[in-house]
């Protein structure tokens, strides 16, 4: 495990409740919610109940930072929050981690047909050379539609190098993942300071997808209540400056796991989330906590699962809250803005109530209240913050508050891992340790991947329902793990790519562009998150260790390999699959390595 503390030295946020940490925290304590009925064509073709940032807030930020409005809505709130936590200081030596579920996906609206004509090798769209790569609307590897280029556009505003910019997209746990990544990189000695950003804005792409799952509530959501009937979406940005020294609130434990059960529904037992909670507490040396800040989406199965995880962890008597009624589910931003609120609650020794809660409606006991709850005074306080999401992902952070001065993190941690085997899939060939194990005389991906599946994989009818990226990862992992045995928590999965789920994003966007939002398919939408390929692999191979997705163009795997070694130490994993995987318009590449810890 990676023992040590990193400190929250500054924070900032923009939500549907307004701009600024103090403003948002004060609103929570008053019971004010930012979720309301919204009629906004940017967000949905029909009215929706959501936490949407007022146009006046965006207008003020554009006036301050970007009067020409060259930045997207997602980018402008990220720029503001980063600027707020950095203040007048320079960015020399600072690392940046940006978390987002869908980033600038709104740029795809009306442009999906252009992307289907994009050819990666030539950079051409339907025979026409693509626009300058910095143009947000330009199809290509430099398009701001992709999270990697989006992050670089933001980082360049502050003089932060691309090599010091990391981008994670782990569905609903993206924000907590980013905090965990930053903490580990600081404890490794690579950085002394890191900025963590979580950001997502709403649009038709997202709302139509969640509507297709019938998971949205027309009323303000009611987490854990017997009358809960679904979630509310939201948009927000939060940023924190994490440092090696400080006082006040620190992060002393972090853990990520996977259910290995289902790509769109949580475990029915709660064991995956429980594993994350247990590991985060163990890493921090904590045997109990003073407050629990859970994901609390107000969907039937999520809230049920969380109650079971709390029971498994023996924390059923600890005061619990969900912040979703205040902000909505802000996706990639949620883990960051909610961690910021948890830090404020520890500092002020008060837990904000969960609006709308009346009668417990989950199978296991939870200590939840709609009113504010005072936390113990005169002692160090601990909070456990959790999240879960599509792909079966789970995450937990352990926060501590103490008035003791002069604390600092421990000495840098050195860890190592060796490459046990390598699989390469491209050009209708599969190579294992440079030896061909399968090939097909066909350039068509679908012909190749179906034939490869029948040859190197066991029977699984669910394979044919997967999107192309998941099929590619499924086959590559089958070859890589052949004959390898491990415990379910002893193996992790850390992948990267340039295009992520873009191929399926295009399919989803084409449906709502050519038809209506109501025509969206849940069978398509579930694959519009890149980490879902990891979920499919985890289900097949019973992998309940860490799952993380990085946006990266590094096919050498040097970055993910270095980070995986840290993850293996933090999570006590013996093995970890690392890889780079891409699929777009029939073109594909997958390189997976199996690492073993020394």
Each model region followed by its residue ranges:
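Short conserved active-site loop signatures built around small residues
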Residues: 175
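Conserved functional loop/turn residues at catalytic and ligand-binding sites
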Residues: 190
């Amino acid at each position: 495990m990676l023992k040590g503390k990193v400190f929250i030295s500054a924070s900032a946020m923009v939500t549907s409740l307004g701009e600024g940490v103090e403003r948002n925290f004060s609103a929570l304590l008053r019971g004010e919610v930012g979720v309301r009925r919204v009629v906004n064509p940017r967000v949905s073709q029909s009215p929706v109940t959501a936490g949407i940032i007022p146009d006046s807030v965006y207008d003020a930020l554009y006036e301050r930072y970007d009067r020409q409005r060259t930045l997207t809505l997602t980018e402008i709130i990220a720029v503001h929050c980063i600027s707020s936590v950095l203040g007048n200081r320079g960015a020399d030596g600072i690392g940046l981690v940006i978390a987002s579920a869908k980033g600038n996906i709104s740029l795809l609206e009306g442009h999906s047909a252009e992307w289907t004509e994009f050819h990666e090798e030539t950079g051409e769209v339907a025979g026409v050379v693509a626009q300058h790569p910095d143009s947000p609307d330009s199809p290509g590897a430099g398009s701001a539609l992709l999270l990697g280029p989006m992050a670089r556009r933001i980082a360049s505003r502050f003089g932060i190098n691309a090599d010091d910019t990391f981008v994670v997209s782990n569905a609903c746990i993206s924000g907590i993942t980013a905090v965990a990544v930053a903490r580990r990189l600081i404890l490794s000695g690579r950085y002394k300071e890191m900025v963590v950003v979580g950001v997502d804005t709403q649009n038709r792409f997202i709302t139509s997808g969640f509507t297709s799952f019938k998971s949205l509530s027309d009323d303000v959501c009611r987490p854990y209540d017997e009358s809960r009937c679904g979630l509310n979406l939201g948009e927000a940005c939060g940023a924190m400056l994490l440092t090696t020294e400080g006082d006040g609130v620190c992060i002393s434990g972090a853990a990520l796991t996977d259910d290995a059960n289902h790509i769109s529904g949580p475990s029915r037992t709660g064991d995956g989330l429980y594993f994350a909670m247990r590991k985060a507490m163990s890493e921090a040396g904590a045997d109990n906590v003073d407050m629990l800040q859970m994901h609390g989406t107000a969907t039937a199965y999520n809230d049920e699962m969380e109650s079971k995880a709390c029971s498994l962890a023996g924390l059923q008597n600890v005061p619990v809250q969900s912040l979703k009624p205040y902000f909505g589910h802000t996706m990639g931003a949620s883990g960051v803005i909610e961690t910021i609120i948890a830090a404020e609650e520890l500092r002020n020794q008060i837990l904000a109530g969960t609006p709308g809660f009346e009668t417990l409606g989950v199978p296991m006991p939870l200590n939840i209240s709609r009113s504010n709850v005072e936390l113990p005074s005169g002692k160090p306080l601990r909070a456990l913050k959790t999240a879960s999401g599509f792909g079966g992902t789970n995450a937990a952070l352990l926060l501590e508050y103490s008035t003791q001065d002069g604390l600092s993190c421990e000495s840098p941690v050195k860890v190592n891992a060796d490459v046990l085997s390598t699989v390469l899939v491209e050009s209708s060939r599969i190579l294992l340790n440079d030896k061909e194990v399968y090939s097909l005389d066909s350039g068509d991906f679908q012909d190749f991947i179906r034939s490869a599946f029948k040859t190197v994989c066991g029977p699984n009818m669910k394979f044919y329902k997967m999107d192309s990226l998941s099929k590619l990862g499924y086959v590559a992992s089958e070859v890589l793990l052949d004959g390898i045995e491990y415990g379910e928590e002893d193996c992790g999965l850390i992948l990267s790519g340039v295009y992520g789920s873009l191929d399926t994003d295009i399919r989803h966007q084409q449906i709502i562009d050519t038809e209506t939002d109501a025509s969206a398919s849940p069978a398509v939408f579930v694959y519009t998150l890149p980490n879902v390929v990891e979920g499919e692999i985890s289900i097949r191979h019973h992998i309940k260790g860490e799952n993380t997705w990085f946006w990266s163009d590094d096919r050498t795997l040097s970055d993910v390999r270095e980070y995986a070694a840290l993850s293996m130490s933090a999570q006590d994993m013996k093995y970890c699959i690392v890889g780079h995987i891409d699929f777009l318009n029939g073109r594909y590449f997958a390189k997976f390595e199996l690492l073993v810890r020394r």
